[in-house]
Amino acid sequence: MITAQLNNLVNQLKNYSASLEKSNILIDKPWTIIDDDNEIQRLIFKKDKSLILSKNGQVQIGKWDYFPEAKSLLIDRFSDKILCNEAFIDEGILILKLDGTNNNHFILANQNIIPDLNILEYLNNQRKNKLNLVGFDLVDGNKLEVESTEY
């Protein structure tokens, strides 16, 4: 369910995606991911290509590199290395797809912008803002969204 909803939101927002070629989006920000154990991990990408990884206060130092020709981010997490391709990028969220997969996402939220880490709500709000959508509650309980022509 979340994967389908996430894919739908990413498809609607892809024309508004930034790129990691502008490294100021990535560097020196508190990027946060909720891992498979439902624990929060924080990643801080440094200008010198080092990567600070923190989980439960335990820190490891990894490395990262960006390959603009492939729009891919290589992340060396000390225990493993992963290659991720850009799916959707903005100042609040990095949605990356693990290379060679269709639906295996690596999602990082900028905790300064999304303090509650609710990425679906953030993306839905971005979708409404970028696409100028206005929502209406219908009497049958459904919602109707239409594009607003007012700016």
Language model regions located:
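Lipid interaction determinants
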Residues: 1-61, 68-151
